Amino acid sequence: MKKKLHLGFVTTYSGRWPKELPEQRDREYGGWLEKNLPEVDVVKAGQIGCTSQALEEIVEQFKEHSVDLVVMVYGAFTGDDAAAYLTEMLDVPIILWAPYEVPFEKNTRLYANALCAMTMNAASLRRLGKTY
């Protein structure tokens, strides 16, 4: 009998960023994984990881489902606490997924800054000796 991969999916952002883009990315990227990986058990986090309490609850959910791997999508900029906490508590590899930045127009702000966050998070995970 073939064993099914249990993939934990979570979208993150730091609380000071607007939440509309992270919510959109959570639906879009979570839906993409479910549609394109039918042979995988995609365990979608019950909430977006934007606070310590939310991350604790997500870890418990992922432990209950015995996830083998985590895919973390940057809904917007996320400090290195989220990726570090997930990998330390779950002890599974993590895929850091930084979507393209929303088009930037003069006199407005960045809405995600995901690539910057992903690079910073990868450096932190490397220092911790975690697989990403």
Segments from the language model and where they lie:
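An N-terminal assembly and electron-transfer interface module characteristic of large anaerobic redox
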Residues: 1-132
